[in-house]
């Protein structure tokens, strides 16, 4: 099993989990196709992490891309950056800029 992570990505975890659902339990080539047609920002980020995990597998263990399968996709919430927007009469309302930690684990297919 080979793992790749991306941390502190400026994508809301709730939206990133939607994109992660597209690639669960697929082969690596199918998952890359699914993510390349996704219009979500999280899809682009997950595709980069998936490519990194595949590169780790090819570099460290000489595993062929065709034999790899997406074993686990995890989207965890990162820190929340708090900003404020000015409102009328001296008030303010909070703006929460959420971040995500993306983890993709790939491995060889079960026979």
Curated annotation (Swiss-Prot):
Does the keyword Magnesium belong to this entry? no
Instruction: Tell me how this protein assembles.
Output: Part of the 50S ribosomal subunit.
Q: Which PANTHER family match?
A: CHLOROPLAST 50S RIBOSOMAL PROTEIN L22-RELATED, LARGE RIBOSOMAL SUBUNIT PROTEIN UL22M
In terms of Gene3D superfamilies, this protein maps to:
Ribosomal protein L22/L17
Q: Does the keyword Ribosomal protein apply?
A: yes
Per the entry, what this protein does is:
This protein binds specifically to 23S rRNA; its binding is stimulated by other ribosomal proteins, e.g. L4, L17, and L20. It is important during the early stages of 50S assembly. It makes multiple contacts with different domains of the 23S rRNA in the assembled 50S subunit and ribosome. The globular domain of the protein is located near the polypeptide exit tunnel on the outside of the subunit, while an extended beta-hairpin is found that lines the wall of the exit tunnel in the center of the 70S ribosome.
Q: Which gene encodes it?
A: rplV
Q: What is this protein called?
A: Large ribosomal subunit protein uL22
Q: Which UniProt keywords apply?
A: Ribonucleoprotein, Ribosomal protein, RNA-binding, rRNA-binding
Q: Which segment of the chain is annotated as a signal peptide?
A: none
């Amino acid at each position: 099993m080979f793992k790749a992570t991306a941390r502190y990505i400026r994508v809301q975890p709730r939206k990133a989990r939607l994109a992660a659902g597209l690639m669960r339990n697929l082969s690596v080539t199918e998952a890359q196709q699914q993510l390349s047609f996704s219009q979500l920002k999280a899809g682009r980020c997950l595709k980069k992490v998936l490519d990194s995990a595949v590169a780790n597998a090819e570099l460290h263990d000489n595993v062929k891309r065709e034999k790899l399968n997406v074993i686990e996709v995890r989207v965890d919430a990162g820190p929340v950056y708090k900003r404020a927007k000015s409102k009328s009469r001296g008030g303010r309302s909070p703006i929460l800029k959420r971040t995500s930690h993306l983890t993709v684990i790939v491995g060889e297919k079960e026979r």
